[in-house]
């Protein structure tokens, strides 16, 4: 079998201890990587794994705190206030929902797997498949949402005379983001399972991840290349082209006619937003490129890692760096781009000071609404 953690596969041959080989219905091997397979050699006791465990623990704790709290604040403020609702923020909300679910559901299980139990899954096959699936769906939702945001910004800035998306089109786009992500992530749940990784002092270390049969190696590699193209290379190239064209429009093209203060303010707002989005794209590439690169080398050039004792530890660190990208997205979208905290504080004040509600202006009272996204400029949030 080729074992896969997250959405990647381990292709080398692994020979489990003879006392346990008969209980396994598949051929599965880490032997080429010289992983510890007996009580005399435990990779979880090495200094390398100890350092990796600290890095992984800090990353997962950061994801749970930043993405859990930050995305909750954003979703709550977006639900409460009409002024925060436009197409861009609705797309960001989908990214926030997926990251929030990972932070509160997947990360606690992964903290237990990587840090507490040190590479041993104790929660059963169903949860193993569910956690793998949810994490993979979240990645694809994030990627597709970022791509949709880039295209939306491109159309709004480079082709301002073209009509913007209406409510029905926006709803269809959001549904498409989720449906594509849900469908192409199905193999991460279907092939997810548990198996004995190695034995330490008569205790089994249970691996949780995707395991593809040996006779389906070609299918796995084809699937991975499809994902690599559709969910990484394609979106990155498209977003880069969109932001390059937008940058030319905002920074290098002269604006005809007299520029009023309102026009200059709108231009500053658009530049600020595009800079944030470009930083998010850069962070996405820096976080996920090592993960995909590591996976390509491991699955297509396995001899590179032959006899590399700390291979698996290195992969887990690379995987955690990739997952940490969600923290960068949350910080940028919640604290930089949107003034979300200002609206969240206002919401808290309205909740804890009910006596002041009667003195609120009609503009404030109009904030609680289910209206369709508008295109006004408000604190650089509206982006026409």
Curated annotation (Swiss-Prot):
Annotated disorder: Hypogonadotropic hypogonadism 3 with or without anosmia: A disorder characterized by absent or incomplete sexual maturation by the age of 18 years, in conjunction with low levels of circulating gonadotropins and testosterone and no other abnormalities of the hypothalamic-pituitary axis. In some cases, it is associated with non-reproductive phenotypes, such as anosmia, cleft palate, and sensorineural hearing loss. Anosmia or hyposmia is related to the absence or hypoplasia of the olfactory bulbs and tracts.
Name of the encoding gene: PROKR2
Family: Belongs to the G-protein coupled receptor 1 family.
Source species: Homo sapiens (Human)
Effect of residue 85 to H: In HH3; decreased signaling activity
Subunit structure: Homodimer.
Biological-process GO terms, alphabetical: cellular response to hormone stimulus; circadian rhythm; G protein-coupled receptor signaling pathway
GO terms for MF: G protein-coupled receptor activity; neuropeptide Y receptor activity
The name this protein goes by in its record: Prokineticin receptor 2
Result, substituting residue 164 to Q: In HH3; phenotype consistent with Kallmann syndrome; decreased signaling activity
């Amino acid at each position: 079998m080729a074992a896969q953690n997250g959405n990647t596969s381990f292709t080398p041959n692994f020979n489990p201890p003879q006392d346990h080989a008969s209980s396994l219905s598949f051929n599965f091997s880490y032997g080429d990587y010289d992983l510890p397979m007996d009580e005399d050699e435990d990779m979880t006791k090495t200094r390398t794994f100890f350092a990796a465990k600290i890095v992984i623990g800090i990353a997962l704790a950061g994801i749970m705190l930043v993405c859990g709290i930050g995305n909750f604040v954003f979703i709550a403020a977006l639900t409460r206030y009409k002024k925060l609702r436009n197409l861009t923020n609705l797309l960001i909300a989908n990214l926030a929902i997926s990251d929030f679910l990972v932070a509160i559901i997947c990360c606690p299980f992964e903290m237990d797997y990587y840090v507490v139990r040190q590479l041993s899954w104790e929660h059963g096959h169903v949860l193993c498949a569910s956690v793998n699936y949810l994490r993979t769906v979240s990645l694809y939702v994030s990627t597709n949402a970022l791509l949709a945001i880039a295209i939306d910004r491109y159309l709004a800035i480079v082709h301002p005379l073209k009509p913007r998306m209406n409510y029905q089109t926006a709803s269809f786009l959001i549904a498409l983001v989720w449906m594509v992500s849900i469908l192409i992530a199905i193999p991460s749940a279907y092939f997810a399972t548990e198996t004995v990784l190695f034995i330490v002092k008569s205790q089994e270390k249970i691996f949780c991840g995707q395991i593809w049969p040996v006779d389906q190696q070609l299918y796995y590699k084809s699937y991975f290349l499809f994902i690599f193209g559709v969910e990484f290379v394609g979106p990155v190239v498209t977003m880069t082209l969109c932001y390059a064209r937008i940058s030319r429009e905002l920074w290098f093209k002269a604006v005809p006619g007299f520029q009023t203060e309102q026009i200059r303010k709108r231009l500053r707002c658009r530049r600020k937003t595009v800079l944030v989005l470009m930083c998010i794209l850069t962070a996405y590439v820096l976080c996920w490129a090592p993960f995909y690169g590591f996976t390509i080398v491991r699955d297509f050039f396995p001899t590179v890692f032959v006899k590399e004792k700390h291979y698996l530890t290195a992969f887990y660190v690379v995987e955690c760096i990739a997952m940490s990208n969600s923290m960068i997205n949350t910080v940028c979208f919640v604290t930089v781009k949107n003034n979300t905290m200002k609206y969240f504080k206002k919401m808290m004040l309205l909740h804890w000071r009910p006596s002041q509600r009667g003195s609120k202006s009609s503009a404030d009272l109009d904030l609680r609404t289910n209206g369709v996204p508008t295109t006004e400029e408000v604190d650089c949030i509206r982006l026409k």
